A protein has these predicted regions:
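Polybasic, lysine-rich low-complexity intrinsically disordered segments
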Residues: 20-21
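Local cysteine-cluster metal-coordination motifs and their immediate loop/turn environment
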Residues: 123-140
Length: 193
C-alpha cells in the first residue's frame, strides 16, 4: 500500500482521502481495495504433504486465479508472531492442511451440551469468512486467514471408532462456519451422511 497521494500518509478508509488524476479529482477510497488488498483466497497456502490429496485438488479447481504457495506446516503461516488479523481478513488467504491428531476435543463445561454426557467438538476449519461483530472468533486466533483441514475422512474414521464404545454429541462447526464454506468443502453433507 502506498500512502495517500495528498501527502497526508493516511490510508484509513474513512479518512476521505482524494487524489487528482489528469486534473480531475476522484475518490481514492473507491479504489482502495484494488490498491491495497487482494481478493479473498487470492493466495492459497498448501502443505506439501497434502498437495496431491483429492480434496486439495478439488478445492484448488474452485480458485483457478489463486496463487498457490507450498508450505511445510500450516502453523508456519497461521501462527506467525506479529500478524494483523483485521488487515489479513480484508484479503483472507486460505490455508489447506492436514490434521494429524486430536480430531475430537471434550466440550467445555461452560458450553451448552443439551443434556448430553459425551459432548465433544472438532475443528475441520479454523476461522471464518464472515466478520461478525459479536463473534468470539475475531480474537481467538493470531491470524485473519482461514485453515481448512482437507483430511475429513480421518475425522470420520475416528468418529466411527469412538462410536463403537460410546455415544457422542459432536459440535462440527465450533471454530468456524462450516455452512458458509459448504460450496467449497461439502463437509456438512459428509457429516450428515
Amino acid at each position: 500500500c502506498k500512502p495517500c497521494p495528498d501527502g497526508t500518509g493516511n490510508m484509513n478508509r474513512q479518512a476521505g482521502c482524494r487524489q487528482k488524476t489528469n486534473g480531475k479529482e476522484r475518490g481514492f477510497l473507491k479504489n482502495l481495495e484494488h490498491v491495497c488488498y487482494n481478493t479473498r483466497f487470492s493466495h492459497i497456502y498448501v502443505e506439501r504433504r497434502i498437495r496431491n490429496h483429492p480434496r486439495t485438488e478439488q478445492i484448488l479447481l474452485r480458485f483457478p486465479q489463486a496463487q498457490i504457495v507450498e508450505i511445510e506446516h500450516y502453523k508456519d503461516v497461521f501462527n506467525r508472531h506479529g500478524q494483523d488479523g483485521v488487515r489479513q481478513h480484508q484479503a483472507q488467504a486460505l490455508i489447506l492442511a492436514e490434521k494429524t491428531d486430536h480430531f475430537f476435543y471434550e466440550g467445555a463445561p461452560v458450553c451448552q451440551d443439551f443434556g448430553n454426557t459425551n459432548f465433544y467438538y472438532c475443528s475441520t476449519m479454523m476461522n471464518c469468512i464472515y466478520d461478525c461483530s459479536y463473534c468470539y472468533l475475531k480474537g481467538m486466533y493470531p491470524s485473519g486467514h482461514m485453515v481448512l483441514f482437507v483430511n475429513i475422512e480421518d475425522y470420520l474414521e475416528e468418529l466411527d471408532h469412538i462410536l463403537k464404545t460410546q455415544n457422542m454429541y459432536v459440535c462440527i462447526s465450533y471454530d468456524a462456519d462450516l455452512l458458509a464454506m459448504e460450496a467449497v468443502t461439502g463437509y456438512v453433507r459428509l457429516w450428515s451422511a
